[in-house]
């Protein structure tokens, strides 16, 4: 289910979100 998918991918997703957040802050 979704929870298994999230647990498998969450570390990568969190890294991507952090990178997008940094890029957004720099662009602002």
From Swiss-Prot:
It is found in: Secreted. One of its GO terms (cellular component) is extracellular region. Keywords: Amidation, Antibiotic, Antimicrobial, Fungicide, Secreted. The modification Alanine amide is found at residue 28. Its main location: secreted. The keyword Secreted applies. Expressed by the venom gland. The synthetic peptide has antimicrobial activity against the Gram-positive bacteria B.amyloliquefacies S499 (MIC=0.05 mM), L.monocytogenes 2231 and S.aureus ATCC 29213, against the Gram-negative bacteria P.putida BTP1, P.aeruginosa PaO1 and E.coli ATCC 10536, and against the fungi S.cerevisiae, R.mucilaginosa and C.cucumerinum. It is not active against the fungi F.oxysporum and B.cinerea. This is M-poneritoxin-Da4b. It comes from Dinoponera australis.
């Amino acid at each position: 289910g979704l929870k298994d998918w999230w647990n498998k991918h969450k570390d990568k997703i969190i890294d991507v979100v952090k990178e997008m957040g940094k890029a957004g802050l720099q662009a602002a």
